[in-house]
C-alpha cells in the first residue's frame, strides 16, 4: 500500500509486466540506475551488483540537466540502506557536501498477477536541518519518479525478451 505523500516524501507506482526478481535484479545493478535515470544527472556507475545493506558503488553525476547548481562533473557514493531480495531496495547518497544530506531513494516490489507493482519513493524527511533550511528539496520531482518507472518498465521488459 502506498503511503500518503507528504511534503518530505514522494511515492509513485507502476505495474511492470515482469517478475519481482527481474525488476530487483535490474535495480541491484549500479549500471541499471544510470539506464533508468530520467533526470539526466547520472552519467555512469562503477561498482558491483549490490547484495546487501552497506554495499556501496560510485555514480558519476552532472547537474547541468537540472540547470540549478553549476557543479560540473562529480561523483557520489551510493550506500544501500535497505535490501530485501525481490521486495525492497533503498539507498542514500554521499558526495562532497557536508553535512551529508541524508535523503533516501528506494523501491518496493509487490508481486501481482503476472507482474510486479513497483513503488518508487524519494524521502528527504531525515535530511539535516541545514539542508531543510536551504529550500532545495525535493531535488527530483514526482514527474521524474514517474518517468523513471516508465524507463524501468521498458528496460526490464526489453531485458526479459532479449535474454
Predicted regions and their residues:
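A generic structural micro-feature
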Residues: 4-6, 51, 70-74, 97-101, ...
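Hydrophobic/aromatic beta-strand elements that line small-molecule binding cavities or substrate pockets
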Residues: 12-14, 75-82, 93-95, 103-111
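Hydrophobic ligand-binding cavity/cleft-lining segments
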Residues: 1-53
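A conserved amphipathic terminal alpha-helix motif
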Residues: 117, 121-163
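A short, structured loop/turn motif at beta-sheet edges
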Residues: 17-21, 49-51, 81-88, 108-117
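Beta-strand elements of well-folded, non-transmembrane domains
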Residues: 18, 63-65, 124-126
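Intrinsic-disorder/low-complexity, polar/charged segments enriched in Ser/Thr/Lys/Arg/Asp/Glu/Gln
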Residues: 7-13, 56, 75, 88, ...
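Glycine-rich portal/gate segments that line the openings of hydrophobic small-molecule binding cavities
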Residues: 45-94, 150, 154-163
Amino acid at each position: 500500500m502506498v503511503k500518503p505523500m507528504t511534503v518530505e516524501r514522494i511515492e509513485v507506482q507502476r505495474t511492470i509486466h515482469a517478475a519481482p526478481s527481474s525488476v530487483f535484479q535490474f535495480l541491484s545493478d549500479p549500471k541499471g540506475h544510470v539506464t533508468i535515470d530520467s533526470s539526466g544527472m547520472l552519467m555512469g556507475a562503477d561498482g558491483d551488483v549490490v547484495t546487501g545493506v552497506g554495499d556501496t558503488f560510485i555514480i558519476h553525476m552532472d547537474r547541468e540537466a537540472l540547470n540549478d547548481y553549476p557543479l560540473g562533473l562529480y561523483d557520489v557514493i551510493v550506500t544501500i540502506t535497505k535490501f530485501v531480495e525481490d521486495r525492497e531496495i533503498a539507498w542514500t547518497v554521499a558526495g562532497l557536501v557536508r553535512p551529508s544530506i541524508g535523503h533516501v531513494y528506494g523501491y518496493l516490489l509487490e508481486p501481482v498477477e503476472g507482474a510486479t507493482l513497483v513503488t518508487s519513493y524519494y524521502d528527504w524527511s531525515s535530511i539535516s536541518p541545514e539542508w531543510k533550511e536551504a529550500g532545495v528539496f525535493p531535488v527530483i520531482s514526482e514527474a521524474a519518479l514517474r518517468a523513471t518507472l516508465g524507463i524501468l518498465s521498458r528496460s526490464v521488459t526489453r531485458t526479459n525478451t532479449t535474454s
